[in-house]
Amino acid sequence: MQYWGKIIGVAVALLMGGGFWGVVLGLLIGHMFDKARSRKMAWFANQRERQALFFATTFEVMGHLTKSKGRVTEADIHIASQLMDRMNLHGASRTAAQNAFRVGKSDNYPLREKMRQFRSVCFGRFDLIRMFLEIQIQAAFADGSLHPNERAVLYVIAEELGISRAQFDQFLRMMQGGAQFGGGYQQQSGGGNWQQAQRGPTLEDACNVLGVKPTDDATTIKRAYRKLMSEHHPDKLVAKGLPPEMMEMAKQKAQEIQQAYELIKQQKGFK
């Protein structure tokens, strides 16, 4: 009920013997309270809707990526289950993720339409869009190889989310570098295949994670580090619309960034 503020304001004015102008003042104060409460309730409703859409779209697009290679195998389903495990999805949340994954596997899944809808609810929040794309890239590389059809789907996703080809290619390099810190996958030289990371991280890997060059100065590297940490701060992302279930992945990404930065500082000798 959006009138409680006005009712209480008028009641308090009458009890205090405020007369006509006291009632008017109580009514105005109550009106301001009702408006503030209404805006807050609308924000929470929009926030829940944004988180629900982010969650559903994430797993729908995962399903679409998997189906783009052809028939969905048991291995593909196992990989999807592993990603759900990483997000600590259980019970109703896991069932919802599985249902969304199946929706994405349909032959007529409207990818471009879904991406436009997703972009519109993000309201230009690039950190949310970036997190979504990073999750999809991880899903595409999870089986150890990047199928040409998966790459084509990723390009469509990036295009509809307003990410240029150059930005997307940089994301790929950042994910490749991050694989050395997060136990993921790395790309084989000269090809599109990715394999389980076996070597330790190098300065080049760390710089790729931060999107900088080994020759960049300390100021440039620190600026890139702070920007990435701000964009991947789990609490900030959840406040902007990231589903709480995906906070763990945001934490893991932030840890990769932190580890990469520490290695760069050690290798280049700055604090």
Curated annotation (Swiss-Prot):
Homodimer. It is found in: Cell inner membrane. It comes from Escherichia coli O157:H7. GO terms for cellular component: plasma membrane. The keyword Cell inner membrane applies. It comes from the Bacteria. Residues 1-6 are periplasmic. InterPro entries: DjlA, DjlA_DnaK_co-chaperone, DjlA_N, DnaJ_domain, J_dom_sf, TerB-like. Regulatory DnaK co-chaperone. Direct interaction between DnaK and DjlA is needed for the induction of the wcaABCDE operon, involved in the synthesis of a colanic acid polysaccharide capsule, possibly through activation of the RcsB/RcsC phosphotransfer signaling pathway. The colanic acid capsule may help the bacterium survive conditions outside the host. PANTHER family: CO-CHAPERONE PROTEIN DJLA (PTHR24074). The transmembrane domain is a dimerization domain. Keywords: Cell inner membrane, Cell membrane, Chaperone, Membrane, Transmembrane, Transmembrane helix. Residues 205-271 form the J domain. GO terms for molecular function: protein-folding chaperone binding. The chain crosses the membrane at residues 7-31. It holds the Pfam family TerB. Its main location: membrane. This is Co-chaperone protein DjlA. The keyword Isomerase does not apply. Residues 32-271 are cytoplasmic. It is a single-pass type III membrane protein.
